[in-house]
Regions:
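N-terminal helicase ATP-binding lobe
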Residues: 1-246
Length: 246
């Protein structure tokens, strides 16, 4: 039972054989090729499409009242629209060898590093590594050698399905900053889960991607404020700021 575990210590809800939900696998720290990443993300999205089909069949087969069926099909129509958005964003923005795919993988790198340090900062494990004669700083080779079962032995740290989907849904909103992107400007994606569901990691991933995009796309003009975080409670604002600044 992980329901009482801290947010970033809950095991991700993996889909069946979904290696592409593993954060380190998606990052620049893994040996996975761009094509393998794209293929995995395609399978991830198609799993959502398959789920929608199953739900539609379930509604049709069950003895629901007409008004109940209408509500169900309306919601599934919205799901289908998001499924099409996911496919469009992947095909349009995450192209093999593109800068956008590099930004996406670097975002996963930053999330993995943040999680690793969040777990081991001040602990004996990290002190032992720093005292080791072979320690050469916190560079790419160091993080490549780190195990990714950070919070639970044997389970790779990864995105929950809704977190990865939320990031993919917003690729166009971040990577396409042309002012005439009117269709996208009409959409606002809201992620809602009870406390401990993983909302923070989902939008921290987007913030990281936004920062990387601005700096890589606009160089020195890409500095400055990239995201504004505001909460209704002052203590919550402080807590979330501490988490975001790790």
């Amino acid at each position: 039972d992980t329901s009482k575990a801290p947010l970033n210590q809950q095991a991700p809800e993996f889909l069946s054989n979904s290696k592409v939900q593993q954060i380190k696998y998606l990052s620049t720290l893994s040996a996975a090729t761009d094509q393998e990443i794209i293929d995995g993300l395609n399978k991830f999205i198609e799993a959502y499409g398959h789920w929608i089909s199953i739900k539609k069949a379930s509604v049709e087969e069950n003895d629901f009242k007409e008004n109940e069926k209408e509500v169900a099909f309306n919601e599934l129509t919205k799901c289908s629209a998001d499924y099409e958005r996911l496919k469009h964003n992947l095909e349009t923005y995450l192209i093999v060898g593109s800068d956008n795919l590099k930004k996406f993988r670097l975002m996963n790198t930053s999330m993995f590093i943040q999680m690793w340090h969040g777990k081991y900062a001040g602990k004996d494990e990290i002190k032992q590594k720093m005292d080791d004669a072979s320690f050469n700083g916190f560079n790419a080779d160091f993080y490549k050698s780190c195990n990714d079962d950070i919070f639970q032995t044997g389970i790779s740290s990864g995105w929950r399905a809704f977190q990865l989907a939320f990031i993919l849904l917003n690729l166009d909103g971040i990577l396409d900053d042309t002012p005439d992107n009117l269709n996208r400007n009409e959409l606002v994606d809201l992620v809602w889960f009870p406390t401990g569901g993983g909302k923070t990691e989902a939008y921290l991933g987007l913030i990281s991607l936004t920062i990387l995009h601005r700096r890589m796309q606009h160089k020195e003009r890409g500095g400055g404020t990239a995201a504004i975080m505001r909460y209704t409670l002052r203590l919550l604002t402080l807590q979330q700021f501490q988490r975001a600044s790790k």
